[in-house]
Amino acid sequence: MRVIETARFTLEPQIAAHAEEMFAVLSDPAIYEYENQPPSSLEWLRTRYTKLETRCSADGREQWLNWVIRVPTSELIGYVQATVRPGHAAIAYELSSAHWGRGLGHGAVKAMISELVEHYKVRSLFAVLKRDNLRSVRLLERLGFSLASPEQHVAHKAEVGEVLMCHECRRA
């Protein structure tokens, strides 16, 4: 995995050493209006990040690509992630509510998508999110995602109250 630098932030490959700072970010209650729940403890998060440092599933079928988002003040403000299988990826992201509405989430997801297309040969992307999370729906729509078909919802096991959004990528 590469470090991805932009003028507004840096995406750093996530490692266990990020756990302490990210625990504070992920303890932001506003994030969980539409998400499940915060990490139960710093130790739990550190263990999770250690596992994710392998960058792949035990059977080798999936690549786990996780980046933390660092702004120029050196503060971590969230993460972007992709679970990659040949040709496609499931993406997810979380951003501290203190940084919502500034275009940083959009920029970070866009930078990750560019990396996935250029260096991991990803051609299609999908994201599962809560239907009521309009901020996230709009972010994905601005990046070219659209609502998936009912058949795709079933295939990706989207649950009641969730929406599946898809995007077909083209190389620039």
Predicted regions and their residues:
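Short loop/turn motifs at secondary-structure junctions and domain boundaries
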Residues: 57-62
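Acyl-donor (CoA/ACP) binding surface of acyl/acetyltransferases
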Residues: 1-33, 66-172
